A protein has these predicted regions:
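Catalytic metal-binding acidic patch
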Residues: 44-85, 89, 98-106
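N-terminal amphipathic/basic-hydrophobic helices that include classical n-h-c signal peptides
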Residues: 1-13
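Extended, basic/helix-rich recognition subdomains
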Residues: 176, 180-239
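Conserved NTP/Mg2+-binding pocket subregion across the NTase superfamily
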Residues: 14, 18, 81-193, 200, ...
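Helical scaffold of the NTase/Pol beta-like nucleotidyltransferase catalytic core
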Residues: 11-45, 74-77, 275-276
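Structured mid-to-C-terminal alpha-helical surface segments
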Residues: 214-276
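Glycine- and acidic
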Residues: 14-16, 65, 245-251
Length: 276
């Protein structure tokens, strides 16, 4: 019983330590969000590695922002340009991590319906487009089913109410539909070229979620998948996991055939669970 009591406390201490590690950057990002969105801002939730499993060398700072009304074009551009100053690609800065900000309008997701609409997303992968004056519009985003499930399971409210109070639970069939839809992104080697590690780890997470109905950190899902993989695919996931944790160099691109077989095997296992 004492272990049951002390474990959540230990996890909270760890989580607070991780948040403290990025507190300066976090307060800058939240400051930018508040400055541009203040009158319409309902909530800001920190989710992902920072609060579940700990930040790894290349982990993003993930924020989910909820507002009451759509953003006008002037606000959208000004906000994105200012967020650019608070973020850096992995390995580019000694003090800044990559920031990913997803903005949703309250009435687009509450009550919940699938697929839901995303008002804005900012991430380092958009940097060149943003600098060229290209800004992504609001769009339907199947990933919101996964993102909101993550936020309800593990997040910290930096502004506004707790995620589990604010958001409806995402029905399991919608989560499965989103997971299944994500699988269609990866069919042949060009689909994962340059992003091998992330695709291997994301497939592990999707497999874990399909079987358990829950969402796990990448390294935890990789360990889980490792126990279920045939021996010939284990080196792929082991290398992805070690590279993610910063323990080894990422050489997955040199395992082309093995990698392709791994992707098709895991997709097959996931499809057995979620259909299609």
């Amino acid at each position: 019983a004492s272990l049951r009591r002390s474990l959540p406390r230990a996890l909270n201490i760890m989580r607070e330590a991780v948040i403290a590690e990025v507190s300066t950057q976090l307060s800058e990002v939240v400051g930018v969000i508040e400055r541009h969105l203040e009158p319409t801002l309902l909530a800001v939730h920190l989710y992902g590695s920072a609060v579940d499993g700990g930040l790894k060398p290349h982990s993003d700072i993930d924020l989910l922002v909820t507002v009451t009304v759509r953003l006008d074009e002037t606000t959208r551009r000004a906000l994105i340009n200012d967020l650019l100053e608070t973020s850096a690609s992995p390995g580019e800065s000694e003090i800044l991590r990559a920031v990913e900000v997803t903005i949703v309008v309250h009435d687009d997701i509450i009550p919940w319906r699938y697929p839901a609409k995303r008002e804005l997303q900012f991430g380092e992968w958009q940097r060149n487009d943003i600098l060229a004056g290209i800004f992504e519009p609001a769009t339907i985003d199947i990933d919101l089913a996964i993102l909101l499930t993550k936020a309800r399971e593990h997040s910290v409210a930096l502004v506004g109410p707790a995620a589990e109070e604010l958001f409806d639970p995402v029905p399991e069939q919608d989560l499965f539909e989103a997971l299944n839809e994500t699988l269609t992104l990866w069919n042949s080697p060009p689909d994962w070229a340059g992003d091998e590690r992330n695709v291997v780890l994301t497939l592990s997470r999707i497999w874990y979620s399909a079987v358990t109905g829950r969402i796990a950190p990448k390294d935890v899902a990789a360990d889980w998948a490792m126990e279920r993989l045939p021996a010939q695919y284990q080196p792929v996931i082991l290398e992805a996991r070690q590279a993610y944790l910063g323990q080894e160099e990422d050489r997955l691109a040199s395992r082309a055939d093995q990698l392709e077989e791994f992707v098709h095997y895991v997709k097959g296992e996931i499809t057995k669970v979620v259909g299609k």
